[in-house]
A protein has these predicted regions:
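Surface-exposed acidic/polar loop and edge beta-strand patches at domain peripheries
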Residues: 1-123
Length: 124
């Protein structure tokens, strides 16, 4: 199980995994779960899809005469993000390009996922 962080309190509370920066739980003030809780039908909750949504032809990105294997919905959902900021009601997770990512996606990037709970509102 991936490391998880909880934000929120008196209104909504949210739980975010560092693996994929995925929102894995969202509860209202009464404690009722509002988010799909992964099961055999679909093992995810709310995955971050980056750098693509959907599937490329033959799962291959072509750029400047080179081919890169890039599977459906990209790689962010299976990558470990780094927590760069955390408080009771806010968390920021970051994924930077690396040698591993450039083997699949030849562009520099910095992807930040920011989750902020304010009363009954979660902003992503």
């Amino acid at each position: 199980m991936s490391e998880r962080h909880r934000i929120g309190g008196s209104g909504l509370s949210a739980e975010v995994a560092v693996e994929g920066a995925e929102l894995v739980s969202l509860r209202d003030a009464s404690g009722d779960e509002l988010l799909w809780q992964a099961g055999p039908e679909w093992p995810r909750h709310a995955p971050v899809l980056f750098p693509i949504v959907g599937r490329l032809a033959a799962d291959t990105l072509r750029h400047d005469g080179q081919e890169y294997a890039l599977t459906q919905h990209g790689f962010a959902r299976d990558s470990t993000f780094r927590v760069t900021e955390e408080s009771d009601d806010r968390i920021v997770l970051r994924l930077d390009d690396s040698a591993s990512s450039r083997a699949r996606f030849p562009f520099p990037f910095r992807l930040e996922m920011i989750y902020e709970a304010d009363g009954e509102t979660l902003t992503v």
